[in-house]
């Protein structure tokens, strides 16, 4: 009986281990080749399994991947949730168990419809089904597209495909390569290993191609203020003015910058409470031929709260006034952090469901760029930068930079902020726009239009990042077309693989 149980569990156990190894492909480890090997091992593990066996193998792979890959979420739950250890572990386990459903959906659907390890199934059907599972994970219940495999390739030769089809194209190419490796191992057809080799070589060749044109005549000096404010103290009434003056004093030392940027919710007060201060800040920035961008919390006349971005100083908005139509309001809110699903049921249960600032309203999906000192910027607040389609649709022909403000203090010294930066870099590469990322305690950095970090400052330090950024002109294919070519590819691949299967079985 023990031998039978071990026989049943050995593949799921192996899958969980392989899934956990996948985290090594992402920041801060960035062993990008792992993202090619671990999906191949998953395809090999489900070979010859029944649908029921495959679903558990895929689920175990997902448990391993997300238990290791999003372990940083526990830092926030334990540090700010106000619940006992058992409740913290339960919530973390529930999140991991939910996310593992999507790899299980992939393995079940593959074994259900394309069980045979044919070349067509592994190179077309498997990548298509993987993308569908990823899309569902990025959409269901507001979506959580973290750890999409393509993000791990930001520094690999495959990164050159990102301006063509975005991070999803990189995921597709990884799965095509993984399918070829699995086919080679299962059928001992080692010539199939040429496929991932060709993909990587093609990516290297594409790295010399630039889809957009830099505009050196519009080079801009920016100063990013990293306040390093303790999250436990930030919203205490006694800390309001010390925090505000900290950012103000650091800005005064950098008035020679064209644009000074503060992080998400840098001002620990409602905008409506600070009209005199903001008016004076606006005047000071104008006097110094500069502009300041900051995250701030807003309350509208109807009582709704917004996580917002404002710009003062040299802007097209005129003298400072409390006008919410001239602000960017965060659209994609963080579940439980900025809104609570099933609010009336969950809020009374535990402090975790009643965190400060967890009743925000959404801004529009597409909003005007923030303009500072003549430079339009496509904004994304914190978590929004992981939603590629939202960022893409907010970039216009006039956009000079991508702007993302964040506060990753919730996640301490975990790997979460490093993965967050990795994702932000991908947005710059996809859209061919330099990226400005200003945070409370790191990672604060700027990148060029290829997603390469130009300058950064260490985490957990009060510091100012000075850099010069060069805007670009033109559009990448991904900016123009989005993911539609991939949707078509997925449909055609599944249709072709299904037709071939029916013809073979006839």
UniProtKB/Swiss-Prot annotation:
The keyword Amino-acid biosynthesis does not apply. Its EC number is 2.3.1.269. Keywords: Acyltransferase, Cell inner membrane, Cell membrane, Membrane, Transferase, Transmembrane, Transmembrane helix. It is a multi-pass membrane protein. Disulfide bonds: none annotated. It comes from Vibrio vulnificus (strain YJ016). InterPro entries: Apolipo_AcylTrfase, C-N_Hydrolase, C-N_Hydrolase_sf, LNT_N. Pathway: Protein modification; lipoprotein biosynthesis (N-acyl transfer). The chain crosses the membrane at residues 26-46, 66-86, 89-109, 113-133, 166-186, 192-212, 479-499. This is Apolipoprotein N-acyltransferase. It is an enzyme of class 2 (transferase). GO terms for biological process: lipoprotein biosynthetic process. GO terms for cellular component: plasma membrane. The gene is lnt.
């Amino acid at each position: 009986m023990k031998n039978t149980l071990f026989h049943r569990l050995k593949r799921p156990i192996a899958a969980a281990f392989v899934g956990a190894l996948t985290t090594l492909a992402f920041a801060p480890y960035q062993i990008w080749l792992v993202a090619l090997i671990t999906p191949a091992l998953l395809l090999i593990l489900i070979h010859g399994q029944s649908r029921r066996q495959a679903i558990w193998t895929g689920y175990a792979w997902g448990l391993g991947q997300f238990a290791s890959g999003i372990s940083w979420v526990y830092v926030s739950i334990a540090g700010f949730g106000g619940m006992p250890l058992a409740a913290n572990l339960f919530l973390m386990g529930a999140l991991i168990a939910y996310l593992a459903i999507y790899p299980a959906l992939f393995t079940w659907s593959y074994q259900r419809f394309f069980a045979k390890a044919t070349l067509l199934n592994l190179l077309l059907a498997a990548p298509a089904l993987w993308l569908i599972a990823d899309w569902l994970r990025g959409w269901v219940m507001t979506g959580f597209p973290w750890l999409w495999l393509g993000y791990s390739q930001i520094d690999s030769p495959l990164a050159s495909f990102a301006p063509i089809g975005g991070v999803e194209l990189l995921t597709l190419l990884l799965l095509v390569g993984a399918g070829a490796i699995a086919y080679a191992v299962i059928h001992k057809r080692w010539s199939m290993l040429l496929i991932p080799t060709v993909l990587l070589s093609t990516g290297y060749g594409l790295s010399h191609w630039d889809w957009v044109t830099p505009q050196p005549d519009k080079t801009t000096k920016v100063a990013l203020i990293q306040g390093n404010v303790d999250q436990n103290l930030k919203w205490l009434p006694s800390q309001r003015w010390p925090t505000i003056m900290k950012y103000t004093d650091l800005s005064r030392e950098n008035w020679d910058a064209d644009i000074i940027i503060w992080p998400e919710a840098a001002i620990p007060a409602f905008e409506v409470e600070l009209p005199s201060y903001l008016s004076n800040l606006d005047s000071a920035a104008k006097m110094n031929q500069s502009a300041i961008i900051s995250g701030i919390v807003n309350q509208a006349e109807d009582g709704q709260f917004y996580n917002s971005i404002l710009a003062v100083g040299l802007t097209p908005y005129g003298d400072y006034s409390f006008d919410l139509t001239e602000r960017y309001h965060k659209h994609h809110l963080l579940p439980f952090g900025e809104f609570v699903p099933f609010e009336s049921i969950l809020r009374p249960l535990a402090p975790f469901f009643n965190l400060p600032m967890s009743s925000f309203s959404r801004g529009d999906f597409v909003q005007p760029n923030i303009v500072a000192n003549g430079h339009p910027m496509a904004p994304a607040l914190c978590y929004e930068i992981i939603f590629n389609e939202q960022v893409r649709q907010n970039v216009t022909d006039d956009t000079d930079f991508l702007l993302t403000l964040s506060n990753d203090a919730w996640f301490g010294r975990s790997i979460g902020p490093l993965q967050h930066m990795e994702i932000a870099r991908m947005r710059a590469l996809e859209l061919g726009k330099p990226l400005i990322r200003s945070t409370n305690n790191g990672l604060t950095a700027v990148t060029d239009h290829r997603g390469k970090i130009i300058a950064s400052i260490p985490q957990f330090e009060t510091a100012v990042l000075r850099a010069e950024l060069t805007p670009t002109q033109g559009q990448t294919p991904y900016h123009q077309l989005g993911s539609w070519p991939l949707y078509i590819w997925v449909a055609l691949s599944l249709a072709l693989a299904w037709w071939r299967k029916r013809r073979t079985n006839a």
